[in-house]
Amino acid sequence: MEVTNLTKNYGSVVAVDSLSFSVNRGQILGLVGPNGAGKTTTLRALAGVHPPTDGQIRICGVDLRIDPVDAKKRLAFMPDEPRLFDYLTVEEHLQFVARLYQTDDYHAKLDALLEEFELGDKRKALPTELSRGMKQKLMIACGFIHSPEVLIFDEPLTGLDPLGIRRMKESIIRRAKDGASVILSSHLLHLVEELCDTVLIIQKGRRIAYGTIEELKWQIAQGRGDVSLEEAFLRITAAGS
């Protein structure tokens, strides 16, 4: 994914201001920032949910503005709140998404995802019968069913228990190792530090820091010992406010 001068305005309010970055295959980028920084707006623009006011977004070389259908086929966006169909079972959700993306021979993949996300015994259950964590797992399983090349997560661990958190982290890492480009936004900086190789920090819609975790930590430490990503984040955002 390549993003160049991404800008999103709501009337006179500039929510995202000339944001540029890239995410290579196999890379996990952490998008972080204070509340109201423009993270969710950025993710929704990248996914084509809210078209940008200006700038270019290329998904695997495909311009999102010029060919939105082809570009969106290559990605999956998992928002912070599961959006499910009230009258579709767990299994039917996966079938619906697979058919929507014209996924060939998806049945084996469907069964594998149900097992991976511990939903096998819930395949005939409706959303009203699922816990918050199970709904989160189902939403992400639906995002994985068509094997997208770009994965966009907004707070992927919400509602998960400790075992679910561990397995979700393993699932994200596995997709990156298989060649997916991953963008992950979270307020859990220890999660970002654990999973991501690159971090983009935004504030008031602008990029204020961008680089590998080690580069950002070194920038703050300046040879005076190691610092955590949390400490680096707090210092960088304080300087940018």
Feature locations, PLM:
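Conserved ABC ATPase "signature" region
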Residues: 95, 99-122
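Conserved ABC ATPase signature
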Residues: 126-133
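Catalytic Walker B motif of ABC-type/P-loop ATPase nucleotide-binding domains
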Residues: 151-155
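Conserved ABC transporter NBD signature motif
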Residues: 55-66, 70-71
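Helical segment within the ABC ATPase nucleotide-binding domain
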Residues: 165-178
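ABC ATPase "signature
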Residues: 210-211
